Structures are given as C-alpha cells and as structure tokens.
From Swiss-Prot:
Gene it is expressed from: atpG
Protein name as catalogued: ATP synthase gamma chain
Organism: Mycoplasmoides gallisepticum (strain R(low / passage 15 / clone 2))
Transmembrane segments: none
Compartments reported by the entry: Cell membrane
NCBIfam families: ATPsyn_F1gamma
Domain of life: Bacteria
Family: Belongs to the ATPase gamma chain family.
GO biological process: proton motive force-driven plasma membrane ATP synthesis
HAMAP family assigned to the protein according to its UniProt record, in alphabetical order: ATP_synth_gamma_bact
Membrane topology category: Peripheral membrane protein
Record-level GO cellular component terms: plasma membrane; proton-transporting ATP synthase complex
Subunit structure: F-type ATPases have 2 components, CF(1) - the catalytic core - and CF(0) - the membrane proton channel. CF(1) has five subunits: alpha(3), beta(3), gamma(1), delta(1), epsilon(1). CF(0) has three main subunits: a, b and c.
Alphabetical UniProt keywords: ATP synthesis, Cell membrane, CF(1), Hydrogen ion transport, Ion transport, Membrane, Transport
Lineage: Bacteria, Bacillati, Mycoplasmatota, Mycoplasmoidales, Mycoplasmoidaceae
C-alpha cells in the first residue's frame, strides 16, 4: 500500500492535471461555439448553392449516364482526408482513419488535411500512399485556404490520374454525437443532395434544362465549383466536431481526475486515521504499564 507521502504527492499531481483539463475544456468550448457560428452563417449560402448545382446535376443524370471517367480508364482514386493537427480529441482521428482504410485500395493516393493521421497510416503500411500533407491551424481555416487545397486537387485531376475524388470528414450530429463520413466530389454524386433539397429543386427549377454551350463544358465546371464549396464546408464541420470531441474528452478527463482524487483522499484519510489510532493505542498501552 502506498504511504501517506506518496498519496499526498499523487493528489497534488492530480490537482494540477485537473486544472489543465478544465482549462482545455473551457478553451475547446469557446472555439466550438466560434466554429458553430461560422458553420451557421454559411448554411444559407450552401442551401442556395446546392439547389442550383443540384438542379443541373440531377437533371443531367436523369437524361445522360455519367461519362466523366478519365480517358486513361484509371481505377485509382484520390482521397482528401480531414483530420486534426493536435491530439486529445477522443476517437475523432481513429474513426476517420478506420473509414479511410476500409475504403482504400492499393493504388489510391491520399492528401491529408491535418497531420495527426500520419502515424495511424504509417502503422498500417499506407504511408507511401500519402502524396501531400497540409498543416492547418484555427487561424487559416477560411475559404481561401480551402480554395488553395481544392486548386491543388483539381490540378492533379487535370492530369487524368483519378477515377474519382473522395473526401473523408466528420459529420456533426450534435455536441455528443458525430460520425466519420465519405463524400464523392468528382464525379459529383447526386446522393449528396438530401431529400428536402431535391424537393425544393423540383419546385423551383424546370425538369428539363437546356445546356449551353454544352454538358461537356458545364458539368465539369460546376463539379469544380462544387468541390471547392463542399471542401470548405467539410473543413468547418470537421472543426466543429474536433472541438466538440476535445471538449467531451477533457470533460471526461476532469471527472476522472475528480474521482481519482477522491479515491486517494479517502485512502489518505484512512491511513492518517489508522496512524492516529495506533499512536493513541501506544500512548494508552504505555500509560498502563
């Protein structure tokens, strides 16, 4: 059994750790609220943009099968994987990594947005498939940054290297629940448009749309714009999930620190009481002689 001195030292250490986790929880809460506000401000734009793009893409898919596979008939895919720059966010990165690995083929290539997933992929022998890693922080999460990433992705796609471009990100459900998801960016997948969006599209736009100068020009151009917009949305939504996950992890850590402190405090008091009782017994025994 640990001595009173050891228990006291452990309690002091736990107190310091509790202060750190509490401070990190408060910081994560502030950043979570900031990114949630940013996500909320962009929803109106996304809704209108999705409706316009969705009207064209869904109409095109009804009248003509997709023919956007590269001319070299490559089956290689490019994955844009949004993870974190820092740790201490629970199973956030692990869930993203597991989804990626479950879908990843041998010839696929990966662009990481965030550096934390490097070690996960390295231990699973996928490190050679990483062609670029973007280091991100909270200050450079804006549309300009996502535009530069998207521009790089589109330049790679112009070389006709990929059959499709997919993004793995984390979908925000609520402050306690979020899940890793994948979304196909190019060729644009009509399934990304939710049922309510499709209903609004059918009400607002004609069912038969004429394409000028032609679908071979319009559809690729719209898909590039859609990639840029969705990528920015995925970055912001993933950031919301990151800080929600980190806040939850720090909250759990703080509660565990409280429980552990109380456990050691109880043991400390028991040892202290036992020591006092022993000293009293020795005094009584000595006085009786």
């Amino acid at each position: 059994m640990a001595s009173m001195q050891d228990l006291k030292r452990r309690m002091e250490s736990i107190t310091v750790t509790h202060k750190i986790t509490k401070a990190m929880k408060m910081l994560s809460t502030v950043k979570l609220n900031r990114f949630k506000a940013t996500l909320g401000k962009t929803k109106e734009f996304y809704q209108e943009f999705y409706e316009v793009i969705g009207a064209v893409i869904t109409n095109y898919n009804k009248t003509k099968p997709r023919t956007t596979t590269p001319t070299n008939q490559s089956t290689k895919r490019l994955w844009i994987v949004i993870n974190t720059q820092l740790g201490l966010c629970g199973s956030y990165n692990t869930n993203v990594g597991k989804l990626l690995v479950s879908e990843l083929a041998k010839d696929d290539e990966i662009i990481l947005v965030g550096t934390k997933l490097n070690s996960f992929l390295r231990t699973r022998n996928h490190e050679d498939q990483i062609i670029h890693t973007y280091s991100i922080n909270d200050k450079n999460i804006d549309f300009e940054s996502s535009y530069m990433i998207g521009k790089h992705v589109l330049e790679l796609h112009e070389k006709n290297q990929y059959d499709s471009i997919d993004c793995v990100y984390t979908n925000y459900i609520n402050s306690l629940n979020f899940e890793a998801k994948k979304i196909q960016l190019i060729p644009a997948d009509p399934s990304i448009f939710q049922a309510d969006t499709l209903d609004r599209i059918n009400d607002k736009f004609p069912k038969n749309i004429s394409f000028e100068p032609g679908v071979d020009v319009i559809i690729p151009a719209l898909e590039k714009q859609l990639l840029q917009v969705i990528l920015y949305g995925c970055l912001i939504e993933s950031k919301v999930c990151e800080y929600a996950s980190r806040r939850n992890a720090m909250d759990t850590a703080a509660k565990n620190a409280d429980d552990l402190y109380n456990k050691y405090k109880l043991l400390y008091n028991q040892l202290r009481q036992a020591k006092i009782t022993q000293e009293i017994n020795e005094i009584v025994a000595g006085a009786a002689k």
